[in-house]
Amino acid sequence: MELFVWRQILKNLILPPTGPLLLAIAGLALTVITRVRRTGIVLCAGGLATLWALATPVIADHLVRAAERYPALDLRRPLAAQAVVILAGGVRVDAPEYGSSAPNATTLERVTYGARVARATGLPVLVSGGRYEAQAMQESLQRDFGITPRWVESHSHDTRENALLSAAILARDGVQKVVLVTSAAHMERARLEFSDAGIASVPAPAALWTRREYGLLGLVPNPDALLRSQRALYEALGLLEHRVRIMLVSPTAARGAVVPATQPASPQGPPTEHSPPKAAPAA
């Protein structure tokens, strides 16, 4: 099984709802099976209380707001960038109403805003994601927004590979700075990965948090709030993983192994798909 799959399994076991539920189950087991009743009760109550808190809109939105570190991009100001890069966030495989794969809600938010940025700036577009994600993004941009991506990166599995493989493609056309489009909570991690890959970026966050008035409903758990908490904590785990990796591995060495020497820019043409470089496997 690929390392990527094991990493996703581990993250899902830590994140809500699974993490707090496992904590509560462990506490219940200690209470019933062993004599450590006090510790078991504390763990069980702590797991259930954590799950309740993370499912409330007030807590969820505080976590999301903390994860979003960049304001909305002002498209009226000139941007010193050479391309727009849109990152995938999931896909609906074989969506029956489209007759093919289609972007999920997260990816569609990014694609919609990426199209707006591309139109406002006139910059060429690169879409980056897995095989189905990249294809769905390309088709959506063409069908729904009349924009044909110049580059398609369709081999990445995570944000790090988004950055490494996109950097390798962009370097062939001499692109060193991009407008980076992704979800607001994901932007910090995405920018760090692109910086490590040798690409400077202007943040163009999509789906920014907006202030809400809750009243008592803000303290009542709901599935949407739990999902927002999960996404915010997922990004916190991703940033922690990035920091640990940077401490263990030289980012300069990683860049040199992946990004090829810059080549003269190619003329405008149909979207091109590139195979991933073979020199540096993902961590």
Regions found by a protein language model. Name each.
Residues E2-L10, I59, L63-A67, L233-L240:
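Hydrophobic alpha-helical segments of integral membrane proteins
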Residues M1-T31:
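Membrane-embedded alpha-helical segments of integral membrane proteins
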Residues L48, A53-A225, S229, L248:
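A structural signal for short, hydrophobic/glycine-enriched beta-strand patches
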